[in-house]
Regions:
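A conserved acidic beta->alpha catalytic loop
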Residues: 84-94, 117-119
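Membrane-embedded multi-pass helical conduit in multi-pass membrane proteins
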Residues: 42, 306-387
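Catalytic donor/gating beta->alpha subdomain of glycosyltransferases that bind UDP-sugars
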Residues: 170-209, 236-239, 244-307, 395-398
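Short, acidic, metal-binding catalytic loop of nucleotide-sugar glycosyltransferases
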Residues: 66-77
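Acidic donor-binding/catalytic loop of UDP-sugar-dependent glycosyltransferases
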Residues: 90, 152-169
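Cell-envelope/extracellular polymer assembly enzymes that use nucleotide-activated donors
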Residues: 47-49, 79
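Long helical/loop segments within the catalytic core of UDP-sugar-dependent glycosyltransferases
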Residues: 20-24, 114-138, 169-241, 245, ...
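N-terminal membrane-anchoring/stem segments of glycan-assembly enzymes
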Residues: 1-44, 201, 209, 213
Length: 398
């Protein structure tokens, strides 16, 4: 009986992996993609404020600012605001040092903003407080519909052509007669440490399936998704939905903001931006564990069935097939089923390499990545539900 059950589970894993490969090609392989604009035209924008909310980002901030300051001239006045949320490491000093290096050079106006303590009696999560304070700075005179507010994370890296490309897109990127009010880009995910290689390729595939771009871009579909590391708002739309203040207590604020944009009748445009922006989310297992246990349960709407279901899908699809290989010594068909499933895992990674340039590194450790995600999910449910250990960079989210 046990052999039969394993055969059935293995066949389900094969079917699920094959379906995943097909859906990835249909939803991401053919998704709208934004790249450098070789022939930029006139802009509708009159001003751009680029905001980097930071808290203890000494390992990221210099490279982030270097990339921003290396941007091609966007063709309009712009400013760079680093909104420091009370960093206790070297972040502030590094920002000041970087800003002083080329003060006489061209580029944006630069400002390091100390956002001060969060209001007593109010719940502010994550980067919502520094983001809201940077957005509330004085704006130049002019129509707010022509002014833009770009939020990027400190672990994001802009390519030199990124700002020009996105401003050109919002100038001409119209669908169904609606102007773009929020442009968000899915970045190219980069991995460094082993923990990232185990988890991030699997998570990227799940996100691609769970948040289809086509539905997010459909004005009449309620589906709304935004990639928090890169969100470009039309100022008038941002203020109309209440900005980050309206989602102050949300841990996954990007989804809340995207939902508010669509619910208010504004236009959301979600594109693949892998040729323009790169993101490395975590530096080690500890930060990866903290990050995904913070977000996973919220990402499935605090639904325990979806959460446990996602864990079972990952463990069944990526870990079980490797267990079937040695069991092939007992039953040859078990080993064959395991080989087919592992071949499909490799096919998914090959697809990711062809479409997005993701290296095949450590693909054979997918079983370990599946087990790690299988542990992340119940930990995320526990942390989010009880508040115990639910932190980001050491700050409690409860």
């Amino acid at each position: 009986m046990a052999i039969l059950v394993l055969k059935v589970l293995g066949l389900i894993a094969c079917l699920g992996l094959a379906l995943m490969l097909l859906l990835l090609e249909l939803q991401l392989g053919r998704a709208p993609r934004l790249g450098p604009n070789p022939d930029p035209g006139p802009l509708e924008a009159s001003f751009l404020r680029l905001v980097v909310p930071v808290y203890n980002e000494e390992n990221n901030i210099v490279a982030c600012l270097d990339a921003v300051l290396a941007s091609q001239d966007p063709g309009l006045p712009w400013e760079l605001v680093v909104a420091d949320d009370g960093s206790t490491d070297a972040t502030e000093g590094l920002v000041n040092e970087r800003f002083q290096v080329d003060q006489a050079g061209t580029g944006p106006a630069r400002r390091l903003l100390d956002v001060g303590p969060r209001p007593e009696g109010e719940r502010w999560c994550g980067k919502n407080w520094p983001a809201s304070q940077a957005a509330a700075l004085d704006w130049p005179a002019g129509d707010p519909r022509g002014q833009w507010l770009l939020f990027i994370d400190a672990d994001l890296r802009l390519e030199p052509a990124a700002l020009v490309a996105v401003l050109q897109e919002v100038a001409g990127g119209r669908a169904e007669g609606l102007p773009v009010d929020l442009l968000t880009l899915a970045p190219r995910l980069e991995c460094g440490c082993l923990a990232e290689w185990l988890v991030q390729p699997i998570v990227a595939s799940l996100l691609g399936l769970g948040f289809p771009l086509k539905r997010s871009n459909d004005p009449v579909d309620a589906t709304a998704f935004a990639a928090g590391p890169f969100m470009l708002f039309r100022r008038s739309a941002y203020e109309a939905i209440g900005g980050h203040r309206a989602v102050a207590g949300e841990v996954v604020e990007d989804l809340a903001l995207a939902g508010a944009i669509k619910a208010s009748g504004h236009r959301l445009l979600y594109l693949l931006g892998i040729d323009l922006v790169r993101l490395r989310m975590y530096r080690d297992l500890e930060s990866l564990w903290e990050g995904w246990t913070k977000n996973w349960y919220l990402g499935v709407d605090r639904n325990p069935f979806k959460a446990i279901g996602s864990a079972l899908v990952v463990v069944g699809g990526f870990s079980l097939p490797w267990l079937l290989l040695p069991l092939g010594l007992l039953d040859r068909s078990l080993g064959l089923i395991g080989l087919v499933a592992i071949g499909l895992q490799l096919a998914i990674r090959f697809w990711s390499r062809i479409r997005f340039g993701t290296p095949l590194r450590y693909w054979w450790l997918a079983w370990l990545g599946g087990l790690l995600i299988g542990a992340i999910v119940p930990a995320s449910i526990w942390k989010t539900t009880t508040g115990q250990g639910w932190t980001w960079r050491g700050r409690s989210l409860a």
